[in-house]
Design a protein with these regions (language model features):
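An acidic, Gly/Ser/Thr/Pro-rich helix-cap/linker signature
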Residues: 2-110
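Solvent-exposed, acidic/flexible segments
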Residues: 84, 88-99, 108-111, 130-138, ...
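Short, functionally critical alpha-helical segments immediately adjacent to catalytic or ligand/cofactor-binding
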Residues: 111-126, 186-192, 279-282
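Substrate-binding/active-site groove segments that recognize
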Residues: 133-153, 166-169, 173, 197-200
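Catalytic and binding regions of secreted/periplasmic enzymes and modules that target cell-wall glycans
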Residues: 173-200
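Short alpha-helical segments in extracytoplasmic peptidoglycan/chitin-binding modules
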Residues: 190, 265-271, 278-280
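Primarily a LysM-type cell-wall glycan-binding module
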Residues: 243-273
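Extracellular LysM carbohydrate-binding repeats and other cell-envelope/extracellular binding modules
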Residues: 282-305
Length: 305
């Protein structure tokens, strides 16, 4: 049996007409609802294009807006991160908890404060694992981590230790800055590796990040860092209004020094007046249900107060 079906275009037009009629009827003639004024216009919410600054810097190094493509590339990242609302809002919430941990380490190691935003573009300040296997706030690969003092075993993975991984990231960035002479190139190397930056600089015959033709991810990397920095420095200009009580607060913890093996971390947590969920949340670097402690060694574990 054949039936006549209206064309898809007609269905869409008809649906829009009905939807428009419902909207108009609710705002124009609803005498039983005094909260809706007769003749009240429909207000369409429009997104506002974020303003690209006329000048900017990364860690004190000026951004060369006169260079080819620089302004437009920064504009793209500002648009993406301004209107990536849920993720950017979570960045603000998590930063309230973790920047007080990260900032003093950067200062101690002599890194510019701008590099705290690197942890946001790497992981969103979450203990995530990339498809390539990079892990933690600072996204160290398993093979690279030990080179920067991070222990990785079946029971312990210090890529997830925020304090230790931050120190390791600082060491990497300082090495890269020493080699390339630029914080922008140091940041780029954090994404693609020192060898990759070294190769591209040599092959292309340029000497700055802003002139390099890079893979799509690294080409956006420093611009994304700059965009996040701009949004964090003036959130209301980008449409973010964050109440203090909506931010995540730093964890209140006490340190327990463990000098003997723990056969059952669940039982250990209960003995300390907590539970495994709290233990693993505060110590995500504990990757097993037990913990081996060598003779004469001691390991610091954070527990809720």
């Amino acid at each position: 049996m054949h039936t006549h079906r209206p064309k898809p275009g007609f269905i869409w037009k008809f649906t829009l007409l009905i939807a428009g009629g419902l909207l108009l009827s609710s705002s124009v003639s609803n005498p039983e609802n005094p909260s809706v004024a007769v003749g009240e216009p429909i207000v369409w919410v429009q997104n506002k294009a974020p303003k690209v600054p006329s000048q900017d810097d990364l860690a004190g190094e000026p951004v060369p807006f006169e260079s080819f493509g620089v302004r437009e590339q920064l504009d793209r990242e500002m648009v993406v991160n301004t209107y990536h609302h849920s993720s950017t809002m979570l960045y603000f919430k998590r930063a309230s908890r973790w920047f007080p941990v990260i900032e003093p380490i950067l200062a101690e190691k002599g890194l510019p404060d701008d590099f705290k935003y690197l942890a946001i573009i790497e992981s969103g300040l979450s203990q995530v694992v990339s498809p390539a296997g990079a892990a933690g706030f600072w996204q160290f690969m398993k093979g690279t981590a030990p080179q920067y003092g991070l222990r990785v075993t079946k029971e312990i993975d210090e890529r997830y230790h925020v304090v230790k991984a931050t120190y390791a990231a600082c060491d990497y960035l300082l090495e890269a800055k020493e080699e390339f002479g630029s914080w922008a190139l140091a940041a780029a190397s954090y994404n693609m590796g020192k060898a990759g930056v070294r190769r591209d600089l040599e092959e292309q015959g340029v000497d700055t990040y802003w002139e390099l033709h890079l893979n799509s991810e690294t080409a956006r990397y420093v611009y994304r860092l700059l965009a996040i920095k701009a949004i964090f420095e003036d959130p209301e200009s980008f449409g973010f209004s964050i109440q203090a009580d909506a931010l995540y607060q730093p964890y209140a913890t006490r340190t327990v020094w463990v000098k003997a093996p723990i056969e059952d971390l669940s039982a250990f947590a209960l003995d300390e007046g907590a539970n495994l969920k709290a233990l693993k949340t505060l110590n995500p670097w504990l990757r097993s249900s037990r913990l081996t402690v060598a003779a004469g060694d001691s390991i610091a574990i954070e527990m809720p107060v």
